[in-house]
Amino acid sequence: MKKRFLAILAAALLPSCLFAQFGVVSPLHVNGNQLNDAYGNKVVLHGVMDTPSPYFNKYRWGNTCTDNNISACISYYDKIFGALQNPAKGTYCNIFRLHLEPGWTNDPNKQSTGSDTGEANISRFSATRLQKYLDALYLPIAQKAINHGLYVVIRPPGVCPKDLKVGDAYQNYLKTVWNIVSSNSWVKNNSGIVSLELANEPVHIYNRYGQSSATAMRDYFQPVIDIIRKNGFKGIIWIPGTGYQSQYENYATYPVSDSNFGYAVHVYPGWYGASDTNYDSNAFIYNFQKQVPVVKNKPILVSEIDWSPEKPGAGKYNEFGQWVASNLGSWGTATTSKWGNAWKKVMDHFGNISMTLTSTDDYLDIDNFLK
């Protein structure tokens, strides 16, 4: 059943029409609300996200984020990229979202501190380790992707804490991360092929006084953008919103200041008022534009999205005592025939929405491919 669903999902990734030549990574730039290549062709990107983590990669290349596993990890991704972009076998990805997995950037000798948990806790982050593994691991993976005809969008290590405030420690963390990444000569030389997504899933952003403010998102990310541009990176920057990257209304009135940017958005079943029980495409279009009004004037990268049907008879009770049905292995639960088709109509309506699935496993039967 899952193999059959993967085939359907792969077909859903195909754009309704192809504008630029597929498999050619000509540098991209923002032109109005579209992505254009160096020849002026309109470009819409479709691909997957992944993270060089032993756990999320199901220990296929090793068990630890240590130097002895670097070569095997790079080789693993080289093979995966060969499967993602292979029209002869029915795969048509042209972008890869690379998470700078914090398992490599966190110092194992540091004690974790603070109240934030999981990947939102940055107390063990090491700038020295980021510099080391940027050159030793992350950028070699990115180069392998480019060699296979894939654009690359880089996401910083970890996820945002729930509550952010202008001038806080996490903003300084993002400044440090992007200062290191954007000053790297390889990254700058590949501007246009490599783009940068500033943060992952902010929930709330407040002004420097801890108050709600219409300018807080702009004021939080503008200083990060300024550092990146000062370092000479000329490629596309993707700006996140709040609400786990679903709220962008304030950017319509108070946008960031830059000449080559778009917005990174997340979409899952149940968001924007759309699900398998409410899959009217016109309502989906209306709600998406209401929450993401910037879709009218800037390109959108939906950097996380996935869905698969409910697995009958399986599930669990969550921490609130609510029954949560299982699916075929994705984050979101929905069918392509209902929610998926409605989402396709949203993309076709606006014509400037690119997307990366939340996991390579959403697109490929990896274990079968690696046999």
Go through the PLM ranges and name each one.
Residues 1-8:
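Bacterial N-terminal signal peptides that target proteins for export
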Residues 8-17:
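Bacterial N-terminal signal peptides
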Residues 20-49, 58:
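N-terminal module-boundary/linker segments of secreted carbohydrate-active enzymes
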Residues 27-28, 52, 56-69, 164-195, ...:
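Extracellular glycoside hydrolase catalytic/binding regions
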Residues 66-95, 100, 104-195, 217-227:
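An active-site-proximal structural segment forming one wall of the substrate-binding cleft
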Residues 101, 155-159, 199-201, 242, ...:
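Short loop/turn motifs enriched for small/polar and acidic residues
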